[in-house]
């Protein structure tokens, strides 16, 4: 929950290997808002991961409220209390910025926050 590795897919071979692993592994994957990343995975591989959970959908189910401001499920909104403000400008999301330390920190923090949220929800549901 506090350490992450960020893999930079800076060539087609690595990109292909990682995407193939994502859609073929039997290991359960935890995503927050697979709708976003899943679009890219599906576009490149014409399928989605075999076994995954989406922490955003689960959070929305648990927090559901007619007033959407009372059921916000964005990762930064839900985990900001623990990880602070880690968002970066959308200008950073380009191939030119893939080695930018701020973007790498953002990616690592997103991963840690997703796992932490998943663990918190799982523990809540066990009680």
Residue ranges of each PLM-predicted region?
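Active-site-proximal helix-loop-helix substrate-binding element of RNase H-like nuclease domains
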Residues: 2-127
């Amino acid at each position: 929950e506090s350490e992450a590795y960020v893999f930079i897919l800076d060539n087609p071979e690595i990109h292909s290997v990682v995407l193939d692993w994502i859609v073929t592994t039997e290991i359960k994957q935890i995503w927050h808002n697979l709708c976003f990343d899943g679009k890219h995975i599906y576009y490149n591989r014409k399928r989605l991961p075999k076994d995954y959970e989406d922490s955003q959908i689960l959070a929305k189910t648990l927090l559901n409220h007619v007033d959407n401001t009372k059921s916000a499920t964005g990762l930064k909104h839900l985990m900001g209390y623990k990880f602070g403000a880690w968002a970066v400008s959308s200008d950073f999301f380009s191939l030119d910025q893939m080695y930018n330390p701020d973007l790498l920190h953002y990616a690592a923090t997103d991963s840690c926050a997703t796992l932490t949220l998943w663990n918190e929800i799982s523990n809540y549901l066990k009680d």
